[in-house]
Amino acid sequence: MAYLDEIQLKEMGFKSVGENVKISDKASFYGCDNISIGNNVRIDDFCVFSAGEGGIDIHDYIHIAVYSSIIGKGKVTISDYANISSRVSIYSSNEYYSGNYMSNPVVPSEYTNIHSGTVFIGKHVIIGCGSIVLPDVILHEGAAIGALSVVKEDCEAFTVNVGIPAKPISERSKKLLELESVFKPSAIGDNL
């Protein structure tokens, strides 16, 4: 995997970019002026980011794996230490499928009914492969989403959630908070 260098990152026109950021040269970005990227972030091949006016805020120590996408007009926040596994789709906008409206981004807006909302992904959240997160969702700190789940409602802190729609099935250990307290002071000068 080839990564964009510092000059290329600057030329992209992001709202902000931190240190030690590795973005594949095969990832695609739209609305870069609405995208903020923190420190120690890695974005893999074939990811697609399309930020509307709400923007996309990616905090520190984030990995977004191959073929994932973040798309929509609403605000998307990904908090520290979150992990987005491969083929995850996060939508801050969604169309209605009732048939009462047309759908498709090339149809004028007066004929469509697009809903946009915020998506907040808390610290230490992990989203499993192939999952979908819809608008107006909060994944509270430490929530885990199993592979191939569809998240359309909030997930409580330190719960494991699976299914279509995603529902909690168990609690998740908080041991990672102890590890964070040891890791954080030693993390200066990290290399992903």
Curated annotation (Swiss-Prot):
- Signal sequence span per UniProt? none
Protein name as annotated: dTDP-4-amino-4,6-dideoxy-D-glucose acyltransferase
The lineage is: Bacteria, Pseudomonadati, Pseudomonadota, Gammaproteobacteria, Enterobacterales
Kindly list the GO molecular function terms attached to this UniProt entry.
acyltransferase activity
What top-level branch of life does the organism fall under? Bacteria
Q: Which reaction does it catalyse?
A: dTDP-4-amino-4,6-dideoxy-alpha-D-glucose + acetyl-CoA = dTDP-4-acetamido-4,6-dideoxy-alpha-D-glucose + CoA + H(+)
Q: Does the keyword Transferase apply?
A: yes
Q: Which UniProt keywords apply?
A: Acyltransferase, Lipopolysaccharide biosynthesis, Transferase
Q: State the function annotated in the UniProt record.
A: Catalyzes the conversion of dTDP-4-amino-4,6-dideoxy-D-glucose (dTDP-D-Qui4N) to dTDP-4-acetamido-4,6-dideoxy-D-glucose (dTDP-D-Qui4NAc).
Origin organism of this chain? Escherichia coli
Query: What is one Gene Ontology biological process annotated in the Swiss-Prot or TrEMBL record?
Result: lipopolysaccharide biosynthetic process
**Family the UniProt entry places it in:** Belongs to the transferase hexapeptide repeat family.
Cystine bridges: which residues?
none
| UniProt cross-references to Gene3D superfamilies, sorted A to Z | Hexapeptide repeat proteins (2.160.10.10)
Which EC numbers characterise this protein's activity in its record? 2.3.1.209
Q: Which pathway is it part of? A: Bacterial outer membrane biogenesis; lipopolysaccharide biosynthesis
